[in-house]
Amino acid sequence: MSISGDVDPAFWAGKRVFLTGHTGFKGSWLSLWLQKMGAHVTGFALTPPTTPSLFEEARVVGGMTSIIGDIRDREVLERALLAADPEIVIHMAAQPLVRASYDDPVGTYATNVMGTVHLLEAVRKACGVRAACVVTTDKCYENREWAWGYREDEAMGGYDPYSNSKGCAELVTSAYRRSFFGGASKAAIASARAGNVIGGGDWAADRLIPDILRAVEKGEPVLIRNPLAIRPWQHVLEPLSGYLTLCQALWHDPAVAADAWNFGPRDEDAQPVQWIVERMCEAWGDSAGWTRDESVQPHEAHYLKLDISKARAGLHWRPRWSLGTALESIVVWHRAWRAGDDMHDYCHSELERFAGARFVHAA
């Protein structure tokens, strides 16, 4: 069967999906998307990491089974996964912040590395799982500050504990795939590496877009640590569409799909932080501006891009929204939230705008 780059609602209708990290920013968006397509979703995660949170503001819990638990607790995770009896597993639970990893390196490694081991061990015992996607990050690569994008076969590395732990998670996933998941009767295992994800509903600390929104709401200049740092920015729905497409491919053609995959933006959307800040301030209006934070900062990479040629050719996946469109959507989303709009309905409308004609309401 040929692999299509489209997310197929008919495929997901009725599928049993186990999703870790469902209370986070990306996990909440993915939970809503899966619910809208008629999947039976069981989520496993810690309580929402921020107040406010997208999970609560969009009433994500209403359409799924939500289990509050810690992936560092192997027995609890295993019981939850086996009880859910999933056909598809998507592993997104993580300690996701570079700066937080400097404060708690032990917790970061325990969550991002051993949490992945615990998840894959549970999948080994779950007879009904046919596809599993382990989500890591673009920062898993050994960053050499190259001007070109990293490909999936580049060396794993990572300067800081977060990035390094995600490189380790990639190595764990590769070892488990080769050691335990070969053969037609086994689950097909893949890993997915996404760029810097942005979108409405992100209130995390020490992340660019939430920091910008917090500052402009207060009428204060945005403090920017590294204005010339270049990242592969993408709207949150872009990589999520990649994960869903990858799971479909794992189901239909595991020999091709059981591998590592990059999901990033077009080359022209790898922009410096200053470019993002200036356009967000312009879109917000009200004389919003920025200034450089001159305090001493921990190390962060200056230049990072992803090569998505493999996903284009092998999965027929492609980015849909430009960076400009993504930034505009964030400002509109945030203004709607501030105005008291129903964010559950608004998020569903956002999903339809992103998916366009491909999106079909589940019966």
Say what each PLM segment does.
Residues 22, 228-232, 296-300:
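Glycine-rich loop motifs involved in handling phospho/adenylate chemistry
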Residues 236, 259-260, 296-317, 339:
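Conserved C-terminal active-site "lid" loop/helix of NAD(P)H-dependent oxidoreductases
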Residues 1-11, 323-363:
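Amphipathic terminal alpha-helices
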Residues 144-149, 153, 161-162, 167-254, ...:
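NAD(P)-dependent short-chain dehydrogenase/reductase
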Residues 104, 122, 126, 179, ...:
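Generic structural signal for alpha-helix termini and adjacent loop/cap motifs
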